[in-house]
């Protein structure tokens, strides 16, 4: 298919994309942007040099007169030697264009331009196993059990093929950074971390790949094993993780694996002390349920403060925030703010899993998302991410962050009164939480020319079609990447007979012995 913009010649080191529609909040422009946004989903954004360069005159963008009601602005972007050389407000024609100083001129036709995406919470090691070991009930408990069953099929060869298939898919959709949680038990961990290291090196320069150890909180009862895990994570330059109050029964005495009763605070202290000793950042699964009793985020926040932890903390899911009273919600969010926690919402997966009837005959009554706008009001950084794709926890998905953004807008009503800062939730904010540097996730003069051009010209157009004809630019080069075909997975998925999974209705022993691994 012919691209809707003819790319510059591959040898061209200088070109200008005119008439690109860009969210003001992902541009490096004058500090006036702090007066124009409506919803803050990135803590201290107006103070960060990563987001707004103070008194920048080179950008020549006046947000008062150029941005529309959704914070979109029409700009010209000049790329030189793989970097963004200049960003300025679009004009019909300017002197630089007439005398050739802007290089080849390309017309974006007012199409939306975004920085490349950062997907901060995924599980690519489990990807594309949904048909092999099917979650018959579609529930969180059913996912746990069928995921355990699928373990018999794992080898380094098939794991490599599935994980790389996912990376190729994300890259073709315009993602430049992925953080994946990795199964880290004795058998699977012996495979996942070496394969992760191999792929991280292979994909260096295309996708920044980060790994998080995935363990339930009760695992940390074993001091020797938990210390060895921290040592393994450190050796692989990873992030330490734990699932806290993160099952259907999270926050209650019926969850011995992730809530852990009276031992919860002691175990959290152990997690933080290991992170301090081994100088590791932390990434938790927390409160993936609709239980008012589930207050894992509060306990993590208090543990961070109690242990004077200074590293980066990310907390994914946080669904039970929607079940809290107004008073408790305020207490939890204020604690998370003090602990400098970044919250990640996984709307697609939690729409599929949460509040599902195990018999399948009832419609869910609540949404599996935290209270995103209330979190933003407390000035807590928020990210949106893919989570699982085509596995036991979500039978669909393609690591397309535009789809994640689009559906999050619909699910959480992020578009009113204005989308404001929310584009940062899939670009700038996760890049900062992942420590990717000052220009990643931004369109910034002097930064890498890494961005995605869409044909849709406003959000209503962008979100109404798949944008399958999007154009990917990396380091100034136009990338001819396409999503891989599913038949590439046939050699590993067809060699195994489909696994017979758990019965639709679980018995009580199953319920008490489930172990959350999402």
Question: What are these model-derived regions, one by one?
Answer:
Residues 112-113, 130-181, 187-202, 227-234:
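Alpha-helical scaffold segments that flank or form the walls of functional sites
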Residues 191-205, 221-314, 318-342, 359-384, ...:
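Histidine/acidic residue-rich metal-binding segments in metalloenzymes
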Residues 111-132, 288-290:
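Di-metal (Zn2+ and/or Mg2+/Mn2+) metal-binding site signature of metallo-dependent hydrolases
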Residues 24-35, 58-76, 365-366, 416-423, ...:
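Acidic, glycine-enriched loop/beta-strand segments at the rims
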Residues 93-115:
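Active-site metal-binding motif and surrounding structural segment of the metallo-beta-lactamase
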Residues 1, 281, 302-313, 366-454:
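His/Asp/Glu-enriched, well-ordered alpha-helical/loop segment
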Residues 1-99, 459:
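N-terminal metal-binding scaffold of metallo-dependent hydrolase/deaminase domains
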Residues 445-503, 513, 517:
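C-terminal cap of metal-dependent C-N hydrolases
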């Amino acid at each position: 298919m012919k691209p809707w913009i003819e790319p510059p010649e591959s040898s061209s080191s200088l070109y200008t994309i005119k008439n690109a529609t860009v969210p003001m909040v992902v541009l490096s422009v004058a500090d006036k942007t702090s007066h124009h946004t409506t919803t803050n989903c990135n803590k201290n954004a107006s103070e960060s040099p990563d987001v707004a360069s103070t008194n920048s005159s080179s950008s020549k963008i006046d947000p008062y007169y150029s941005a529309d009601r959704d914070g979109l602005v029409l700009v010209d972007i000049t790329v030189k030697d793989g970097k963004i050389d200049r960003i300025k407000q679009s004009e019909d024609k300017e002197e630089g264009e007439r005398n050739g100083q802007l290089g080849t001129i390309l017309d974006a036709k007012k199409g939306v331009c975004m920085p490349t995406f950062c997907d901060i919470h995924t599980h690519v090691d489990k990807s594309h196993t949904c048909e092999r070991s099917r979650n018959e009930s579609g529930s969180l408990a059913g996912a746990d059990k069928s995921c355990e069953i699928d373990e018999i099929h794992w080898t380094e060869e098939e794991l490599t093929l599935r994980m790389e298939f996912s990376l190729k898919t994300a890259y073709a959709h315009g993602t430049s950074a992925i953080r994946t949680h990795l199964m880290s038990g004795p058998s699977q961990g012996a495979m996942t971390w070496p394969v992760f290291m191999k792929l991280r090196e292979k994909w260096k320069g295309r996708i920044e790949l980060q790994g998080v150890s995935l363990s339930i909180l009760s695992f940390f009862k074993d001091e020797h094993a938990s210390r060895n895990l921290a040592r393994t994570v450190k050796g692989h330059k990873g992030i330490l993780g734990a699932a806290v109050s993160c099952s259907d029964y999270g926050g209650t005495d019926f969850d011995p694996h992730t809530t852990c009763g009276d031992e919860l605070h002691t175990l959290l202290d152990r997690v933080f002390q290991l992170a301090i000793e081994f100088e590791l950042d932390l990434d938790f699964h927390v409160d993936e349920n609709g239980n008012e009793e589930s207050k894992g985020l509060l306990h993590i926040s208090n543990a961070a403060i109690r242990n004077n932890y200074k590293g980066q903390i990310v907390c994914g899911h946080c669904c039970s925030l929607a079940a809290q009273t107004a008073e408790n919600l305020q207490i939890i969010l204020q604690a998370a703010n003090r602990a400098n926690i970044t919250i990640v919402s996984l709307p697609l997966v939690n729409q599929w899993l949460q509040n599902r009837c195990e018999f399948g005959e009832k419609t869910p009554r609540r949404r599996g998302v935290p209270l995103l706008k209330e979190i933003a009001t407390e000035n807590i950084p928020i990210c949106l991410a893919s989570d699982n794709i085509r596995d036991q926890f979500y039978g669909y998905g393609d690591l397309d962050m535009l789809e994640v953004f689009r559906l999050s807008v619909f699910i959480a009503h992020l578009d009113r009164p204005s989308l404001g800062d929310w584009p940062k939730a899939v670009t700038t904010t996760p890049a900062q939480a992942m420590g990717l540097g000052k220009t990643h996730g931004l369109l910034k003069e002097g930064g890498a020319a890494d961005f995605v051009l869409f044909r849709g010209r406003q959000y209503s157009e962008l979100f109404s079609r798949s944008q399958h004809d999007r154009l990917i630019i990396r380091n100034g080069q136009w990338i001819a990447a396409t999503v891989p075909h599913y038949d590439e997975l046939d050699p590993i998925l067809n060699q195994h007979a489909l696994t017979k999974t758990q019965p639709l209705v679980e018995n009580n022993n199953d319920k008490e012995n489930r172990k959350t691994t999402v």
